[in-house]
């Protein structure tokens, strides 16, 4: 087993914990749908986060040629999956609260600041991550990557500071469309 394979185990576990929390949260919503008031914006953010967890796992493979690995680089690489895992925890009430009625709109707005600040932190971490893979790799991502980073960061910070429902409705859809397009254009292939 090489260094990349060894280190990717922990990265995969953290990402899998985030995916598990999202899928378990969806299951809890479905099982107790008569006691839960679903909020469609919250549902779109569930999809957005799950998509991001999958993309993070997908693009981690681009670290496969990194030599040598050191502890500090590995700690840095752990930041992105950790951010996404923590965001997955904020999307859903604690499992111990799942037996009580949940209004997901109330839950969403009670946690939106922390959720979006965490998600916004992903952007500069991803930029540094891309730079650490080398300047040629960073430049190969092209202007779409840079523009999307600006749009992600500004949109997420705005979502963190505003409770304006129309903005949250718009941005949930915009984020999903943007992520789908950027993923198709930049991260379509594994290598």
Q: What do the predicted segments below correspond to?
A:
Residues 61-89:
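Alpha-helical transmembrane-segment detector that highlights a single hydrophobic TM helix
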Residues 28-41, 64-69, 97-108, 160-171:
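Membrane-interface helix-boundary motifs at transmembrane edges
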Residues 1-18, 187:
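Hydrophobic transmembrane alpha-helical segments in integral membrane proteins
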Residues 81-147:
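Membrane-proximal helix-loop-helix units in multi-pass membrane proteins
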Residues 44, 168-180:
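Central hydrophobic cores of alpha-helical transmembrane segments
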């Amino acid at each position: 087993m090489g260094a990349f394979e060894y280190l990717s185990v922990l990265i995969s576990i953290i990402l899998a914990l985030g995916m598990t929390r999202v899928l378990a949260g969806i299951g809890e919503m479905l099982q107790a749908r008569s006691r839960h008031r679903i909020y469609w914006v919250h549902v779109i953010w569930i999809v957005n986060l799950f998509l991001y967890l999958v993309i993070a796992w997908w693009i981690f493979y681009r670290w496969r040629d990194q030599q040598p690995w050191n502890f500090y680089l590995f700690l840095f690489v752990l930041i992105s999956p950790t951010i996404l895992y923590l965001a997955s925890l904020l999307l859903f009430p604690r499992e111990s609260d799942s037996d009580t009625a949940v209004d997901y709109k109330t839950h969403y707005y009670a946690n939106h600041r922390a959720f979006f600040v965490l998600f916004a932190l992903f952007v500069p971490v991803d930029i540094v991550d891309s730079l650490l893979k080398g300047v040629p790799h960073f430049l190969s991502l092209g202007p779409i990557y840079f523009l999307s980073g600006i749009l992600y960061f500004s949109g997420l910070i705005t979502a963190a500071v505003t409770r304006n429902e129309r903005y949250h409705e718009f941005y949930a859809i915009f984020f999903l469309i943007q992520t789908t397009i950027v993923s198709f254009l930049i991260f379509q292939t594994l290598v």
